[in-house]
From Swiss-Prot:
Organism: Corynebacterium efficiens (strain DSM 44549 / YS-314 / AJ 12310 / JCM 11189 / NBRC 100395)
SUPFAM superfamilies per record: PLP-dependent transferases
Residues the entry annotates as binding pyridoxal 5'-phosphate: G117, A118, F143, D231, E232, V233, Q234, T289
Catalytic activity annotation: N(2)-acetyl-L-ornithine + 2-oxoglutarate = N-acetyl-L-glutamate 5-semialdehyde + L-glutamate
Modified residues (N6-(pyridoxal phosphate)lysine): K260
Cell inner membrane listed as a keyword: no
Name of this protein: Acetylornithine aminotransferase
Amino acid sequence: MKNLATVEDTLTSWPQVLLNTYGTPPVELVTGKGSTVTDADGNVYIDLLAGIAVNALGHAHPAIIEAVTTQLSQLGHVSNLFATRPVVEVAAELVQRFALDDATIASQTQVFFCNSGAEANEAAFKLARLTGRHRILAATNGFHGRTMGSLALTGQPDKRIPFAPLPSGVEFYPYGDLDYLTTLVESDPTDTAAIILEPIQGETGVIPAPEGFLTGVRELCDKHGLLFIVDEVQTGIGRTGDFFAHQHEGVTPDVVTMAKGLGGGLPIGACLATGEAAKLFGPGKHGTTFGGNPVSAAAARAVLSVIDEEFCADVARKGELFAEQLRGVAGVADVRGRGLMLGVVLDQPVAKQAVTAGFKHGLILNAPADNIIRLTPPLVITDDEIRDAVRALAAVLAELNA
């Protein structure tokens, strides 16, 4: 057996052998349990990022460990030329969670599995084009991925411009502006295929859609025969206190994309379609080698077995506790979001410095903007961990604002 390459120091070797897409990380994490992680020097942190909203059940959750270990010992990968039970069970459960026990909706809903949120949005993009119409309307500041198709849907010029020309036919509307969106649709309704949005924009600072906006978009799509695509990659799987964030308004999209928390740390994404949208794909129209891998599907099945209605209600409660505690911290101007997807708006542009200072105070933070800290902790975070995190963040901000 060949001796594998040896690495003397992880952080020193990182920039030598990995393409410079992320810069060099500040710490090397080696273990995790629940809502905490430990670095190579033994420092313990409360993880308020959860792998960017991925580790819904935290680190080393026993249900995921058991499911993955059992499945991998039986069958690891076979491709979609063959059926495996885990993928069918996960699809059936997602259909039920989407349909909210409406048998008619459930009977018209199907799922495509892939590996990530970007791939799920690529599938949604292709569904929209299969309607025979060309235009897709996406929100300014929205984020749907970094592959070429999902990047075309992303309303952030700094991410788009270096890779032009992107797939054509995407036009942008101000997020939350229903009047502008209506005018844009009605400028060419017969060539407009779909409207895509996130219920809460995460990458630009945790910005919820205005109340009633999703309902208005649903009505606009119904009027003109458009697909309503909701990107739940970051907001879905219980993150906001509802299983899907769009359920907060009681709307039913035509297409829902998801990933991140679905696998609880293993790579799996999904594009769910209902009604006429579910009839657009046929054999050969789309595919993926690893999508629906039985090991990732087993992990997703374990996640879904834990995240039930009672669990989601507790996420909502913990989110309210977190927000209430944060609003009392000096240096915090506002807290927005729902459930355990929160944007902490600071009264000074020190969010990026807070991320760095957070390590010294035992916190893993994320700053999508100069004055915003994004919090997406594991959904299993405890009340005591929330209070400890708020105290630590208060110390960070006091230090920076001194």
